[in-house]
Amino acid sequence: MELATASTMSAAAVTRRINAGGLRVEVTNGNGAAGVYVAAAAAPCSPAAKRVNDGGGKDDVWVAVDEADVSGPSGGDGVRPTLFRTYKVKGSILHPYRFLILVRLIAIVAFFAWRVRHKNRDGAWLWTMSMAGDVWFGFSWALNQLPKLNPIKRVADLAALADRQQHGTSGGGELPGVDVFVTTVDPVDEPILYTVNSILSILAADYPVDRYACYLSDDGGTLVHYEAMVEVAKFAELWVPFCRKHCVEPRAPESYFAMKTQAYRGGVAGELMSDRRRVRREYEEFKVRIDSLFSTIRKRSDAYNRAKDGKDDGENATWMADGTHWPGTWFEPAENHRKGQHAGIVQVLLNHPTSKPRFGVAASVDNPLDFSGVDVRLPMLVYISREKRPGYNHQKKAGAMNALLRVSALLSNAPFIINFDCDHYVNNSQAFRAPMCFMLDRRGGGDDVAFVQFPQRFDDVDPTDRYANHNRVFFDGTTLSLNGLQGPSYLGTGTMFRRAALYGLEPPRWGAAGSQIKAMDNANKFGASSTLVSSMLDGANQERSITPPVAIDGSVARDLAAVTACGYDLGTSWGRDAGWVYDIATEDVATGFRMHQQGWRSVYTSMEPAAFRGTAPINLTERLYQILRWSGGSLEMFFSHSNALLAGRRLHPLQRIAYLNMSTYPIVTVFIFFYNLFPVMWLISEQYYIQQPFGEYLLYLVAIIAMIHVIGMFEVKWSGITVLDWCRNEQFYMIGSTGVYPTAVLYMALKLFTGKGIHFRLTSKQTTASSGDKFADLYTVRWVPLLIPTIVVLAVNVGAVGVAVGKAAAWGLLTEQGRFAVLGMVFNVWILALLYPFALGIMGQRGKRPAVLFVATVMAVAAVAIMYAAFGAPYQAGLSGVAASLGKAASLTGPSG
């Protein structure tokens, strides 16, 4: 176990992909006069004085539902106002939306009944498969739609929170402590430049500096990550005061310097440009040091290894800058120094600051930046790499998060926790304050809120969002609608937690204080560390701030070593009833589910600019692997103790349905996959999937399909997404349904029958394409077996369209066979339209010119049609013989859900 204190850091690789979006700087001259936005009645960087009377709701969609609670600083009745606003969808939109859902549900049931009465006995096997698929489609659609019946929007009122602070007993004393967790594993797949920008944005957040701490979990145990943090701590001494002085947004330097214009909200505009140039120059030098870390450490290690007094013990160690062996993993693996086998490490890089401000110095020759009026304190920063040994299941990210939870309890023990993936950063400096509006508002039921979830927003997704990376339909539609129930599921990043909820304690609404204390005293539940157990009641108290600075003496070191040990979880409740849930790939959803079934609530909220932003995989293969892990984890959740059907009465009925939908959605895609392969029948037989009597069938089908699209347009309206977002979501769902989701079902079946767990690879965020094109990854083809099923479906439907054209040409459009061929072709063309982004993706660089795809498709269809007309059409038999050989049409419908 390694413990140390330092004041510096370092990192490597890849220029961050940035979205330059939205903000403008208007600084006209050096004196900060005209055109400069400066807060007049409030200190720079303070929350806007405007109260959120209209917020996100003054439009033709949303209406406020709590007007009486917002009537000035004291609510008009001597009681504090709520710290957030709640909006509901206007009745003129909500009532028709609900009515259409009901009508479609009735139509689906009527359609099933009609099909049962009109069973096709000539194609019984097709009819049976079709009915099974359609029943599941209808059921799956209902699971997805019912939780959306009561969409609610909640908006944090930062001005009300500022009022509460101002009227508090000790200034900002009412803001409780926050521990911020960042997790990373591989410095190559998760480039270090992403990680260091994430940490820098956290250190510069607009939150009382003595009330939050930042923890980085390096699950790979690499010296590169540690020295990157050493460099970060050093550069933060310049970057953080600069951000505070000029109120810059965003506070991740890579994002900030990539923007061409920024809004200025500070008070010293005359110094902005010179300060900015100086800081940018320092940042470029910082990036050079980060980029060179791999080579720097390797050269240093080689030099030390050559100087071992001629001793050759067969080990080539990785050496730290102080001339000692790195206790984690080495470049050249050795016993106790390889992935999955190394000591635990806790390094305190920045100590907890004092409670009193410490102002910087005036500009001088040695220090050209004037920080004389700026608080230059930095938050606590800690590097952690938990112990790993062979023979132990380290539980991936969930295990790392639980180690962070235990270490932070001993060092800072803040009552609230925010977690980030290493490729996300703080995009809005007020982001830590916003969730406090929900956690601290007891009039709004804040005591029962386990976590606040922000949407995930991404930088540098291609302009057309080919692979639905923004996922706005899910975030701003499905997830937002859960606010009307117990709240959204936990989505893995950009989330603030209540520490008590992570410990598995019950919410105040359901649990008595005595039972909570009894739960804390159960040593078997939380492990052998008595110090950890005794800290839990303090950590669960939201009124407290943060643990005073801890002296790292021998007893604390032993406790830290104990709680990061690889076997600490064994025989305890960690991973099931406490902390993040184990043995499920989607540990985030399962952890949120555990809290909801205990009776906790959650809140989904967003803010402008977005609270957090991150990086999404724009490469087709990496995107498919990402949703493979999500869908596989969902199925693991269904076949585990986290099954929504097993939850108790504290889980809202519609919340139960929402979780059931989250854990079963991949199953329905098995039917979709086979539906998409039914066109093979066009190639090997003369059977069609058209139900008889055809007129009634067509009426039902058109009505059901039309209603789902109208319902979708209502959701587009109230969620604020675009039609393109909705279309991309439909397309990528079909892409997943033809390959990824059925593969996840197959993996789950193998796990159930063999008992072996499923290994899902880490989504790579590295860029392998040329640096001249930030979207080059979009046009890079990485051939993997996961692409094959969708390619087969694509080829089958292109062939089916060709056969349909050939049949229509051979028989004529006015014949029954010709009409059926054209009608069947409509289904095939629809499938091809949904798979269009996939087809572009596998074309690689040629995908930059969609016209090439259209020409190739037309040529392929024409070739199949000509071959069918030449070799497959029975011209020689005459019309009567052809009609006799054709046989009767079989039945099958398209999906009803």
Swiss-Prot record:
The chain crosses the membrane at residues 93-113, 123-143, 664-684, 694-714, 732-752, 786-806, 822-842, 851-871. Its EC number is 2.4.1.-. It is a multi-pass membrane protein. Pfam families: Cellulose_synt. One of its GO terms (molecular function) is cellulose synthase (UDP-forming) activity. One of its GO terms (cellular component) is plasma membrane. Belongs to the glycosyltransferase 2 family. Plant cellulose synthase-like F subfamily. This is Mixed-linked glucan synthase 4. It comes from Oryza sativa subsp. japonica. The lineage of its organism: Eukaryota, Viridiplantae, Streptophyta, Embryophyta, Tracheophyta.
